[in-house]
Amino acid sequence: MWAMPYAYLGPEGTFSEAALRAADLGAEPLSCPTIQAALAAVREGAAERAVVPIESSVEGVVTATLDDLATGNDLVIVAELQIPIAFALLGRPGTELGDIKRIGGHPQAMPQCRGWLAANLPDSEWIPLASNAEAARQAADGHVDAALAGAFAADRYGLEVIAPDVHDRANAVTRFVVVSPPRPLPARTGADRTSLAAFLVEDHPGALLEILTEFAVRGINLTTIQSRPTGDRLGQYYFFIDCEGHVDDARVGEALMGLRRVCREVRFLGSYARCDGGTAQVRPGTSDAEFAEAAAWLGRLRFGRP
């Protein structure tokens, strides 16, 4: 039986491809020109799943991924993984630093290497491209003089490593997520993360506090919260949230129900195992057993048996 491919941000030689291979998903890769195209391939049935970047340790969230998941047709995150990000400066054989006037790379690459470029290539022009591998391909074709990409892309495109380890901060990592159409959730592991997008009814004083309170009173730690414009009109935003725990945890389920009451829309984006193995600290009074005991007590009250 033919297995559907897994989509990723291509072309060959991107960190997204490296993440796909590291995930060892056992499917053929489907290269896509943009993050949006990779997610569209899943929605349209051309791919079973997609592997896309969602957060950089240097630049924060990847807005193209957040906005597509929050506002496009429903998809859910089923897994995550982290990939070390190490850039190299690649060029055609014989290229030296003094020859470089135009450098191509993904927009996320520039901020991670800005200081190095200012110190070593202060007069160069930065050319933002759809991916670092696309920059390598354009360097091979002569459209740019050099590319910021993974060193592994050099062999793919017949380039040489002009400078390895191009970065401002060592040990940078990017978190990637595996995305699928809605399906039964992965079982909770005790070391889980839940992602969602919360849309306000309207912007008003205390709106963010209302959202945060639903988590705080249940002892749920947020690992990410990011406001993003909805695109509908100026001043209208949604909040992307990552929290510790699984929707099958009583405290997380209760928090989502609370958000449902105070928000215009809550888009559930998945509960899945954390790749770092971090476990949530369950505050006294917020365990599943304590929620169950409280619910049983309320049930007795309603039947006149306190």
Regions found by a protein language model. Name each.
Residues M1-P306:
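Domain-level signature for soluble enzymes in the chorismate/prephenate branch of the shikimate pathway
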